[in-house]
A protein has these predicted regions:
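Bacterial Sec-dependent N-terminal signal peptides
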Residues: 1-22
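Carbohydrate-active catalytic/glycan-binding domains of CAZyme proteins
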Residues: 21-558
């Protein structure tokens, strides 16, 4: 799969020459996970695996299987490229192999949106065996909420190859659309409807379904509201969203998230004899939640829900779903991660993952797994990029759009000192990857050039109002706490002698605090700022993403 931001970045690298006045060179970026639990509980028995199977922000997972290949996608909100594509052969060892929305033409609406509240929500990945085509359908939520959202889909015959241009679906309102391909060849889209009329009661929500013609690529007829929930006169329920439909043994099963996105989050299931319903709610719902457990328990996984289920070639069922790993004080920088658990079946024929006080544990065993989990997405691992390739790795993202006008790669990463800051709503000269551990060490080495006033270094992002920037800037090493608009604060600053050569920059996360260090050419690491509170970029400061970290250069005033 070709990544546009990366491919064009390299093309520019072949036609531009390095200008030390206007570019910063990054020699490498490394990331090392250091979570205590993984160190103290190694995988030793065949079948062992860690949850989350994709650590760090990997929310709203959707999965499908074709043959013995499993494919999974997650949300990206205001980041580009959109919709990471993961591949696995065993359900627990996942590799980030590409990005579905990798060209600017596939996702032209991100500029100016909130990084963690706007953009791409809840992509759903499906395979239609009747035309041997993969479909990814999603919503781009515009500023102002669901009423301004754009629902669209893209297709591909090969998920590792190119995906089509987006096809807009103006007839599909609301958010969280998902395809269902019935065994008779018919296709449908199920989605959460907007809350406009008729609103029947407080907090009214509805799920709708509409037929889809795979020949024309368009919807057929009008949407049918087939499941209504909310705070009504008979039951106190919160919004249903993220719906998926499955046909199992001749019955239609509807799964939907319920309860919002915080600790009361859950997944519920329904069953019907017809795809249009009526759907009967399972009497023992929720089929998945952790809201009944004590919040101060050891190593809690909270907010479990937004599930998708898949059947193995051997006939077993598994669920992927989102969850959170907060510290006991309820905060973290990881966001909502992707977990895997087996699906069980009740005596009355409904699927479920947990009941009552069942826990989502961090270490589990998958009997069919030969050996133990092998993954660069779970447990402690080291990730390093020397930027030696003319294409960047698929883990890298930018803010609000394509970063290629500002970067080139090959013998290091060169970022132009663009006069765009990382909070502006326009794409700055930065690339970022997800934080995947409470405790980690990330470092880079930068040759800043000689541009007066330019700043280059390590950037940590929660959203456009909450960031931290460890920068080399005009004879100083500076740690900024970046806030709303120009509300920026210098946390620490040290003057450095004029040096020739690369300067090392490092952040060590200790979970609730960060240590920031720098290293002059040929020297040792020096502490710049110790025990800096991490709450400035905590997940709980709002929005739906976790935090990211990477490298950044700017000539904008800080």
């Amino acid at each position: 799969m070709k990544n546009y931001l990366i491919g064009v970045c390299c093309l520019l690298g072949s036609i531009l020459t390095c200008n030390a006045q206007s570019e910063a060179k990054f020699n490498y970026f490394s990331y090392q996970g250091n979570d205590d639990y993984y160190k103290e509980n190694p995988l030793t028995v065949a079948g062992d695996y860690f949850n989350p199977v994709i650590g760090g922000w990997a929310s709203d997972p959707s999965i499908c299987r074709v043959g013995d290949d499993y494919w999974l996608v997650t949300s990206t909100f205001g980041y580009f490229p959109g919709v990471p594509l993961y591949h696995s052969k065993d359900l627990v060892s996942w590799e980030h192999v590409g990005n579905v929305l990798s060209r600017p033409s596939q996702l032209p609406w991100l500029e100016g949106l909130s990084i963690d509240k706007g953009g791409v929500y809840a992509p759903a990945l499906s395979y239609n065996p009747h035309n041997q085509t993969y479909y990814m359908i999603t919503t781009c939520v515009m500023n102002g909420g669901e009423g301004g959202s754009k629902n669209f889909y893209v297709t591909s015959k090969n998920p590792m190859g190119e995906w089509s241009e987006p096809v807009l679906l103006p007839e599909v309102e609301g958010i969280d659309p998902s395809f269902f391909f019935d065994d008779d060849g018919k296709a449908y889209i199920v989605h959460k409807s907007d809350e406009h009329s008729p609103v029947k009661w407080s907090n009214y929500r509805a799920l709708s379904i509409i037929e889809f013609d795979t020949q024309t690529g368009k919807t057929v007829g009008e949407p049918v509201r087939f499941k209504e929930e909310g705070v009504g006169p008979e039951e106190r329920l919160e919004r249903n969203e993220g719906p998926h439909i499955y046909k199992i043994d001749g019955k239609y099963y509807l799964l939907a998230a319920e309860g919002g996105t915080n600790w009361v989050h859950s997944e519920v299931c329904y069953r019907a004899d017809s795809v249009f319903g009526p759907y009967r709610r399972w009497s023992r719902n929720p089929m998945l939640t952790q809201r009944l457990l004590k919040t101060n328990r050891n190593l809690p996984v909270t907010s479990a829900g937004h599930a998708d289920i898949v059947q193995t070639p051997e006939g077993e069922w598994y669920a992927v779903f989102l969850g959170c790993r907060p510290w006991n004080d309820g905060e973290d920088h990881l966001g909502r991660e992707t977990y895997l658990m087996p699906v069980k079946w009740s005596a009355d024929g409904f699927p479920y993952v947990t009941q009552c006080l069942d826990t989502v544990s961090i270490k589990r065993n998958l009997p069919s797994l030969k050996g133990v989990q092998q993954s660069g997405q779970a447990g402690n691992f080291t990730w390093r990029d020397d930027f030696s390739s003319p294409t960047l790795r698929p883990e890298w993202m930018s803010l609000w759009g394509d970063v290629s006008p500002w970067c080139r790669s090959g013998d290091g990463l060169y970022l132009k000192y663009a006069d765009i800051d990382s909070k502006s709503g326009k794409t700055p000269a930065c690339i970022l990857r997800r934080m995947q551990h409470h405790k980690f060490v990330a470092e880079t080495e930068v040759e800043p050039g000689t541009l007066d006033g330019g700043a280059a270094g390590l950037l940590m992002v929660k959203n456009e109002q909450r960031q931290m920037f460890l920068a080399v800037q005009h004879g100083k090493v500076v740690l900024y706490r970046l806030g709303k608009k120009k509300n920026n604060e210098i946390v620490a600053s040290e003057a450095i002698d004029k040096v020739s050569g690369p300067i090392g920059l490092m952040v060590e996360s200790k979970g609730k605090t960060y240590d920031f260090s720098y290293r002059l050419p040929g020297g040792e690491w020096r502490m710049l700022a110790e025990d800096v509170p991490a709450d400035h970029i905590a997940t709980q400061r709002g929005g739906f993403t976790g935090s990211t970290i990477g490298v950044y250069a700017t000539s904008a005033t800080l």
